[in-house]
Amino acid sequence: MIRFFAAPIAAIALLTATAAGAFAEEFDSRDIMGGGPNFFRGGSSPIPRTTVMYNGSYAPGTIVVNTSERRLYLVLQNGQALRYGIGVGRDGFRWGGVHKITAKKEWPEWTPPSQMIARRPDLPRHMKGGIENPLGARAMYLGSTLYRIHGSNEPETIGQAVSSGCFRMTNDDVTDLYGRVGVGTTVVVLNN
């Protein structure tokens, strides 16, 4: 009789251990604490953040956005820069110029501009900050424009031209950049 129950009990124990192991591999408590690879669905960027050699003429601390490359560079000392993948404005929405970061917000609220509502009447008129918000985990506001460098709840759009002119980053990348720059940082947008 004991043998009759021993095999099913052993099978259940094995399945439970296997499922727990798989869950442990997938679940990373840093994900919900803001530092793991799936930070609030920010996902990993299809274009990984990396330090590169940089021979541009911009001063350390400057952000340089290259829309044609779909990359953002934070100029560092010693001829280097941090390079991030970004999503850029789709055709008709790309722009260039020089601005300063005038505000920084964590988990920003979003109010779509009237022009966007006219194009997309299905959009909410206002969204509180959070994981469903298209501005993602952080936003840096550019001058007096409506444009921002911000996170995204759609990490798969990084490297694409899909926005209405803002620069999208994964939540991990925008959180990293946000911690490195301050209000007053110069942002150069190259639209070539």
Task: Report the location of each language-model feature.
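N-terminal pre-domains immediately preceding structured catalytic cores
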Residues: 2-192
